[in-house]
Amino acid sequence: MSMQDPIADMLTRIRNGQAAKHVSVKMPSAKLKIAIAKMLKEEGYITDYAVADEAKPELEITLKYFQGQPVVETIQRVSRPGLRIYKGKNELPKVMGGLGVAIVSTSQGLMTDRTARQNGMGGEVICYVA
């Protein structure tokens, strides 16, 4: 059986892993998943990520906690296969009043909502993280 929405699966694995206080979570790897993991690391929501080069590459994300509590409060899929959400440069949302980030897929690749606003670009809103 094929997976319908691999990005939603990735976000759910992160959410469930932190709820269960796991050190890390593993999932099938893909270029978009690696790009999202890179952004989460740059923004300080995860400790690290690694890709195991095997017959079926696996992405392992090391989760981050602060004083025993998960750093990620909410992680939510916005644009999905059945309903794509596109926003222009002036319509990009501020997650939690600017405390969180929205990951946006633009013509120049994935970037945060802040970076997209600075570059004057809009795109598909992949997810919200706070």
From Swiss-Prot:
Coiled coil: none annotated. One of its GO terms (molecular function) is structural constituent of ribosome. GO terms for biological process: translation. GO terms for cellular component: ribonucleoprotein complex; ribosome. It comes from the Bacteria. Pfam families: Ribosomal_S8. The keyword rRNA processing does not apply. Keywords: Ribonucleoprotein, Ribosomal protein, RNA-binding, rRNA-binding. Part of the 30S ribosomal subunit. Contacts proteins S5 and S12. One of the primary rRNA binding proteins, it binds directly to 16S rRNA central domain where it helps coordinate assembly of the platform of the 30S subunit. Belongs to the universal ribosomal protein uS8 family. This is Small ribosomal subunit protein uS8. It comes from Shewanella pealeana (strain ATCC 700345 / ANG-SQ1).
